Design a protein with these regions (language model features):
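Short amphipathic alpha-helix that is part of the acyltransferase structural core
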Residues: 1-36, 40-66
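Conserved residues at beta->alpha junctions
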Residues: 3, 101, 133-134
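Conserved acyl-donor/pantetheine-binding loop and adjacent beta-alpha core of acyl/acetyltransferases
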Residues: 54-98, 106
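Conserved acetyl-CoA-binding loop-helix of GNAT-fold acetyltransferases
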Residues: 101, 107-120
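Conserved active-site alpha-helix within GNAT-family acetyltransferase domains
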Residues: 112, 124, 135-155
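C-terminal "cap" of GNAT-fold acetyltransferases
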Residues: 136-137, 152-171
Length: 171
């Protein structure tokens, strides 16, 4: 299994449909927001391939404590939680928007491997921190095991994880 940055959009949409991901209003179609993120910068899509087949994906984007994306302000509870986790207002954060892994590939350590890859990937691309909203038990377990700072966003029913990455010089 390997992680590949970027993917041809039609191939990705086909994978999304075939695997019945909820997508746009539960239709199995890639959501408008997700498609916009990928179209604006194909490197914001990371696919997980095994034998040249897509078995999982992650979508990410730049964010801040004040806005999800430019022009999309966070609500008060979300802003307060992020400011607390980040130690104040902060720009140039990565938000891990979505992670999917086909069910038959779960429980094989791929999630752990992904977070190791992702941390190094964003560090190499000039970011020093990321945030991830999760409610899936396996994701919660991985984030807690990795020691990410955590809070609960009651309005969304999700946990918010924040990681301040160590610089290469500190390692």
């Amino acid at each position: 299994m390997k992680f590949v940055v970027g993917c041809e959009l039609e191939e990705f949409k086909d994978y999304y449909r075939r695997n019945g991901f909820a997508g746009e209003q539960g239709t199995g179609e890639l959501g408008i927001t997700e498609e916009k993120i990928i179209t604006q910068d194909p490197a914001h899509l990371i696919v997980w391939r095994q034998n040249n087949e897509i078995i999982g994906d992650a979508i990410w984007h730049e964010t801040s404590t004040e806005e999800h994306r430019e022009g999309d302000p966070r609500d008060l509870e979300d802003r307060e939680i992020l400011r607390k986790l980040c130690g104040g207002k902060k720009d140039n954060i990565v938000e891990l928007h979505e992670i999917w892994l086909i069910e038959k590939y779960r429980g094989k350590g791929y999630g752990k491997r992904f977070f190791e890859f992702f941390e190094e990937f964003i560090r190499r691309n000039g970011y020093d921190s990321f945030v991830y909203y999760a409610d899936h038990q396996a994701a919660l377990a991985i984030c807690r095991k990795r020691g990410y700072a955590e809070d609960y966003l009651e309005s969304a029913g999700e946990y918010v994880f924040y990681s301040q990455l160590e610089s290469h010089a500190a390692q």
